[in-house]
């Protein structure tokens, strides 16, 4: 399993099927970049200048919304993941 370092978080992107108002399904090239995902791994948190470690606010299993162009896409064990900094997470859903 991927183990993120520092304040990084590994997420599995949740793809949504996009349709127009008339019901036409859009091809991948016309879709918006996804901004929703589920946390699958969390680093230990960031270290302040004082040496104190700040624990992450998200947990494994959280459903999140993140910045549109944030993170690095990686493929591991046949699945695609996104590794991003905790600061790129905008909100936890529910």
UniProtKB/Swiss-Prot annotation:
Q: Which InterPro entries match?
A: Chaperonin_GroES (IPR020818), Chaperonin_GroES_sf (IPR037124), Chaprnonin_Cpn10_CS (IPR018369), GroES-like_sf (IPR011032)
Family matches, as PROSITE patterns: CHAPERONINS_CPN10
GO terms for CC? cytoplasm
Give a GO molecular function annotation for the protein: ATP binding
Any idea what this protein is called? Co-chaperonin GroES
Q: What induces it?
A: By heat shock.
UniProt-listed PANTHER family:
10 KDA HEAT SHOCK PROTEIN, CO-CHAPERONIN GROES
Highest taxon above the source species: Bacteria
Q: Which SUPFAM superfamilies match?
A: GroES-like
Q: What does this protein do?
A: Together with the chaperonin GroEL, plays an essential role in assisting protein folding. The GroEL-GroES system forms a nano-cage that allows encapsulation of the non-native substrate proteins and provides a physical environment optimized to promote and accelerate protein folding. GroES binds to the apical surface of the GroEL ring, thereby capping the opening of the GroEL channel.
As for subcellular location, the record says: Cytoplasm
| Major subcellular site | cytoplasm
**Do you know which HAMAP family this protein is assigned to?**
CH10
Q: Subunit structure, briefly? A: Heptamer of 7 subunits arranged in a ring. Interacts with the chaperonin GroEL.
Q: Which GO terms describe its biological process?
A: chaperone cofactor-dependent protein refolding
Pfam families (alphabetical):
Cpn10
Task: Name the protein family.
Answer: Belongs to the GroES chaperonin family.
The UniProt keyword set, sorted, is: Chaperone, Cytoplasm, Stress response
């Amino acid at each position: 399993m991927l183990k993120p370092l520092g304040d990084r978080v590994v997420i599995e992107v949740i793809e949504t099927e996009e349709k127009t108002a008339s019901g036409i399904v859009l091809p991948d090239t016309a879709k918006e970049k996804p901004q929703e995902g589920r946390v699958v791994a969390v680093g230990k948190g960031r270290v302040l200048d004082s040496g104190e470690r700040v624990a992450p606010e998200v947990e494994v299993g959280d459903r999140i919304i993140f910045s549109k162009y944030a993170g690095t896409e990686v493929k591991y064990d046949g699945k695609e993941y996104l590794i991003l900094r905790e600061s790129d997470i905008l909100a936890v859903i529910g």
